[in-house]
């Protein structure tokens, strides 16, 4: 029973790290990356649809994204969705393809993005700690029901703390890498 709780906690902590990494990937750096546009929703035939379902997003060069729209009638909607996103991008239409030059980030904008990334990292750490708290409370319930001993609980707490520290360290490493990436000019 305790092993199942331990495995579940480890799995959930891993998912927290992955979610944090995905959130940080959406923060714009100086380089073009297709995941920048993942959060954009396009009004396609009256339905909000993710951009990657109505167009193919690629990298033309280090500062330019290209968006190839599958349905020519949706070009205007895709262009409007990209312009109205909070990414500060200005697409240029070239037939069925939109070219999106990424403007260089100002020092002030970089610092704002670093604040956002740090907040995401803190959110990830909090989520990992919540998983630890939940797992420990589950084992303490087992102890109250006399299904495990006090020593088992202590050992479990130590193990879960080690997992927690390891996963928080991963989040910190991801944060450090993202900060370095953001500060590159």
Curated annotation (Swiss-Prot):
CDD domains: RRF. GO terms for molecular function: ribosomal large subunit binding. GO terms for cellular component: cytosol. Its main location: cytoplasm. Gene3D superfamilies: 3.30.1360.40, Ribosome-recycling factor. Pfam families: RRF (PF01765). InterPro entries: Ribosome_recyc_fac (IPR002661), Ribosome_recyc_fac_dom (IPR023584), RRF_sf (IPR036191). It is found in: Cytoplasm. Keywords: Cytoplasm, Protein biosynthesis. It comes from the Bacteria. One of its GO terms (biological process) is cytoplasmic translational termination. Belongs to the RRF family. Responsible for the release of ribosomes from messenger RNA at the termination of protein biosynthesis. May increase the efficiency of translation by recycling ribosomes from one round of translation to another. This is Ribosome-recycling factor. The gene is frr.
């Amino acid at each position: 029973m305790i092993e199942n709780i331990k495995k579940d906690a480890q799995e959930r902590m891993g998912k927290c790290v992955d979610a944090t990494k995905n959130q940080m990937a959406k923060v714009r750096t100086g380089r073009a990356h297709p995941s920048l546009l993942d959060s954009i929703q396009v009004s396609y035939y009256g339905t909000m649809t993710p951009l990657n379902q109505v167009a193919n997003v690629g990298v033309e060069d280090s500062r330019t994204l290209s968006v190839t729209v599958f349905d020519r009638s949706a070009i205007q909607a895709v262009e409007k969705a990209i312009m109205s996103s909070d990414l500060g991008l200005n697409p240029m239409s070239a037939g069925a393809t939109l070219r999106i030059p990424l403007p260089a980030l100002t020092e002030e904008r970089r610092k704002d993005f670093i604040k956002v990334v740090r907040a995401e990292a803190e959110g990830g750490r909090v989520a990992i700690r919540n998983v630890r708290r939940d797992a420990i409370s589950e084992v303490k319930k087992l102890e109250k029901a006399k299904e495990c001993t006090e020593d088992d609980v202590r050992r479990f707490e130590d193990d879960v703390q080690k997992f927690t520290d390891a996963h928080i360290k991963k989040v910190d490493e991801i944060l450090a890498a993202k900060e370095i990436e953001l500060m590159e000019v």
